[in-house]
């Protein structure tokens, strides 16, 4: 229920090759700009191939090859009205590592931490901004990540809500209200 989707500042975080953000641009055709943040350079070429197929010159797609820890910096503070994200699911030491370093970086918080990820979302959300991301609860690993999110955010103006559950994965909504 954003009044002017054309001015909506959107981020696809942990973007991979950008498919989720690109798909969003088809469902919300009034969107004019999307930033994509990904740490793995292997996705860069695929991202540019994907946007070449979009054929919508009114869209501005910006690719940032960086760690989400960068979102803690002033430059990114209060920057996005909408964030969508499919982050890693597993904590180091929980779950089976793959022989592939590439797959492990997709699946595990190896380049930073879960706490840093949540703080990065909170810092980069604008007032009244919303972030949607996937979260594996990991209760079978003895973890309660949703409770961890609430603890991380308790001294902030950001709230967390479980809005749906799909095949063992929760969809989490963070909202910032200053």
Could you tell me what each predicted segment is?
Residues 48-49, 95-98, 144-150:
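Short amphipathic alpha-helical segments
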Residues 2-76, 85, 91-93:
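Conserved SAM/SAH cofactor-binding pocket of Class I
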Residues 87-116:
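Mobile active-site "lid"/loop adjacent to the S-adenosyl-L-methionine
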Residues 82:
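Short, Asp-centered acidic motifs that coordinate Mg2+ and/or phosphate
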Residues 27, 97-100, 123-128:
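A short alpha-helix capping/helix-coil boundary motif
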Residues 113-173:
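Conserved Class I SAM-dependent methyltransferase catalytic core
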